[in-house]
Amino acid sequence: MNIRKTITSEIEWNTIKKAQADGKLQELLQVGDELDITLKTGEELTVQAVGTTEHGLIFLLKDCMKDEHGMNKRMTNKGGWRDSEMRLWLNGTIIHMLPDELREMIVPRRIVQTVDGERLESEDKLWLPSFTEMFGKEGAEDWAPADTDETQLELFRTERSRVKERPGNGTWWHWLRSPCGSFSTRFCFVGS
């Protein structure tokens, strides 16, 4: 018989920042590791390492924020992620709610989508995962043809890791940045 326990330890932002600057962040943190953060509004969140890049680790929220936010004010996916209200909200409002030390360490990411034959590009510090990053390439051509050139993030290879909760509501659905291939009014999402 085995017993499995979670180990929690204190870490300072400057320790993480130094590891990132030295190119040793992946020696300190691995995919699946979680960091508890407090927004400047007081909301407490957990970010989780979900994948790796040449710059280090990719962190996304483990669960949903307390308040919901739509992809756009109207029911449309025109312009894809680049033109979405969600993108503007994350990179114009939420980015400034993050702890200063965390915000300074975020490396912007270039996001490219092909929507109706048009190449749409943006560079973002905060972003939602695509259908392909969440579920892999299987089904992406039908569900989310804008993002088929991407690969699945390591953490999301199991269904359990894709489930999120919303404070006070239990398991909850959440948005992906991929325009839904079958509907001009929707973006893809993960159901609970």
Predicted features, each with a name:
Residues M1-S192:
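Collagenous Gly-X-Y triple-helix signature in extracellular proteins
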